[in-house]
């Protein structure tokens, strides 16, 4: 009987996290309402507090959910391209991130929200999505002996390409297809070719 209860609690917790994801997507962190999340799940306003200490822990768990999903996908990708050069791995990771953000628009909206007025824990959780990417970037920069100022500039440009492409695909400004993904790949590769 304990296993059924654990499974039920896990399912309820996951349902709350998924509804919370939609809540964050629509209202942002500053206007997050556990009561709206509970109602979206057909539960009482008190139900989320059986699974999360408070709304802070609830939001942190939603961000952790996004991190775990992306980390699992990125781990598979990096395993597939582990014998490629650091540059190719960086291009692959960048392309995958564009796909991830495009295919999960709610995640993109949450990841791209301003976290300036938020708790440090939220900023740290959002930053955890980039840990493996940062390792690949560091390896590539060491290989090509890239100076810090160039690394900073290129990081900004590559991030701008990634976020712009995901946004353009999501809002229909660019059709989300392989031809356009190849054009984006060309932009990324061109940036790595430039001094």
Segments predicted by a language model, with ranges:
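Hydrophobic/aromatic residues within well-ordered alpha-helical segments
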Residues: 55, 62, 66-70, 93-97, ...
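N-terminal intrinsically disordered/low-complexity leader segments
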Residues: 1-11
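Short secondary-structure transition hinges
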Residues: 99-135, 167
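Hydrophobic/aromatic-rich alpha-helical bundle segments in the mid-to-C-terminal region
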Residues: 109-112, 141-188
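Amphipathic alpha-helical packing segments from all-alpha helical-bundle domains
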Residues: 75, 118-145, 152-156, 186-193
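Alpha-helical DNA-contacting segments of helix-turn-helix folds
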Residues: 15, 24, 59-66, 111, ...
